[in-house]
């Protein structure tokens, strides 16, 4: 049974299942941002020291995305999803049992291995299973799962960590992953690998200047975002001087705004992806530059977080659309590279935020993040004028 012979309802149900999986994976990626203080207290460490866990996770994903994708390029996709979920669940059990920070980091590396494969195939699978003419909407739905991880997963994980301990947060994610795995087994058809590419695809992709320019833009803008975002929880409490509950509410606002960004992109992304992305980068730049000035008011921080969340969702979606449009003949290789490069940016941003917090002042993370954001804005304007491309231009 192929995705072309099923009803639109079933096709959408499969995309929704992938969106739920995206929610699970992004919850576990984002949730340490809201648990840094609790984990640091548990292991008698500084918050900034624990933050290095974010960089390790992201750079493992970056390093392994392409090798794992190539190793599994001929594996049937349903089977591959099941296997990576098993690794994902087992790693969360180890996170729950972690008796030292080192063991916790090892467990997170296991999660990162599963993450590396998942995000290299998910976008292309969503497009493949979507009803005809609904590819942008399918991507938007996957992104909504990502946004919900921030609006629900991250704050809920933080609340669970506050009241039951951070270990229970990881245990709960593991249980959620198990339920999602059972749904995947029931709902997904056999999905033979296609358009996955191989090592032979790499020279071809590297000879596409538009694609390489998108990759460069991705790493710079993601570095800018995560320089500040990685430490937003301790920033709100230690620099702004607001309560832990407000920090949770702020994360809720930022994530919820991502859903707004997803809706905007779903409606306008096909025709105006380039304009949307450049505008969103400009908005990110403003938010980062105003982070410290806004720290004197809960209302100011709340409004800022809404625009910040909208900007990052549009940026993330726009980058995916352009990568898929520029590499329709090797989508999995291109997306594995994208996932790796995105995580290089996450790790770099978390590391920059770590170093700024340890050796300068955590109050400066917004200003420091604004520097690469400005560079990203200029670069986006240059490349989108030279290589305009929309999802409609994909090879069918």
UniProtKB/Swiss-Prot annotation:
GO cellular component: plasma membrane
Domain of life: Bacteria
Gene3D superfamilies given in the database record: MFS general substrate transporter like domains
GO molecular function: carbohydrate transmembrane transporter activity
Transmembrane segments: 15-35, 50-70, 81-101, 103-123, 136-156, 170-190, 209-229, 246-266, 275-295, 299-319, 333-353, 364-384
Subcellular location as annotated: Cell inner membrane
Entry-linked InterPro entries: MFS (IPR011701), MFS_dom (IPR020846), MFS_Efflux_Transporters (IPR050189), MFS_trans_sf (IPR036259), Sugar_effux_transptr_put (IPR023495)
UniProt keyword list: Cell inner membrane, Cell membrane, Membrane, Sugar transport, Transmembrane, Transmembrane helix, Transport
Membrane topology: Multi-pass membrane protein
Primary location recorded for the protein, binned into one broad class: membrane
Pfam family, one: MFS_1
Function: Involved in the efflux of sugars. The physiological role may be the reduction of the intracellular concentration of toxic sugars or sugar metabolites.
Protein family membership: Belongs to the major facilitator superfamily. SotB (TC 2.A.1.2) family.
Classification via NCBIfam families: PRK03545.1
Protein name: Probable sugar efflux transporter
Organism: Escherichia coli (strain SMS-3-5 / SECEC)
Classification of source organism: Bacteria, Pseudomonadati, Pseudomonadota, Gammaproteobacteria, Enterobacterales
């Amino acid at each position: 049974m192929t995705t072309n012979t099923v009803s639109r309802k079933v096709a959408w149900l499969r995309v929704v299942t992938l969106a739920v999986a995206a929610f699970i994976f992004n919850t576990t990626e984002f949730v340490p941002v809201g648990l840094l203080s609790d984990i640091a207290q548990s292991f008698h460490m500084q918050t900034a020291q624990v933050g290095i866990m974010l960089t390790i996770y992201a750079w493992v994903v970056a390093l392994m995305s392409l090798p794992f994708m190539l190793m599994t390029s001929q594996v049937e996709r349903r089977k591959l999803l099941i296997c990576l979920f098993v690794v994902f669940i087992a790693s969360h059990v180890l996170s729950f049992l972690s008796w030292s920070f080192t063991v916790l980091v090892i467990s997170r590396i296991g999660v990162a291995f599963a993450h590396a494969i998942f995000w290299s195939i998910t976008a292309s699978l969503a497009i493949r299973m979507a009803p005809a003419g609904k590819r942008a909407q399918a991507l938007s739905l996957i992104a909504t799962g990502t946004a919900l991880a921030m609006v629900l997963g991250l704050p809920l994980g933080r609340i669970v960590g506050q009241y039951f301990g951070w270990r229970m947060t990881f245990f709960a994610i593991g249980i959620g992953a198990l339920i999602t795995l059972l749904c995947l087994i029931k709902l997904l058809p056999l999905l033979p690998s296609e358009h996955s590419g191989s090592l032979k695809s790499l020279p071809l992709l590297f000879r596409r200047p538009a694609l390489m320019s998108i990759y460069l833009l991705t790493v710079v803008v993601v570095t800018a975002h995560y320089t500040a975002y990685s430490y937003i929880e301790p920033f709100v409490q230690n620099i702004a001087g607001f309560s832990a509950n407000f920090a949770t509410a702020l994360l809720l606002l930022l994530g919820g705004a991502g859903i707004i960004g997803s809706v905007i992109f779903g409606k306008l992304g096909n025709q105006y992806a380039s304009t949307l992305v450049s505008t969103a980068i400009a908005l990110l730049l403003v938010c980062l530059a105003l982070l410290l000035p806004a720290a004197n008011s809960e209302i100011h921080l709340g409004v800022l977080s809404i625009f910040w969340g909208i900007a990052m969702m549009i940026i993330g979606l726009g980058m995916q659309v352009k990568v898929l449009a520029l590499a329709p003949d090797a989508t999995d290789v291109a997306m594995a590279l994208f996932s790796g490069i995105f995580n290089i940016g996450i790790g770099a941003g978390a590391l920059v935020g770590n170093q700024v917090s340890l050796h300068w002042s955590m109050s400066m993370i917004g200003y420091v993040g604004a520097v690469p954001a400005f560079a990203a804005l200029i670069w986006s304007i240059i490349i989108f004028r030279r290589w305009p491309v929309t999802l409609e231009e994909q090879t069918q």
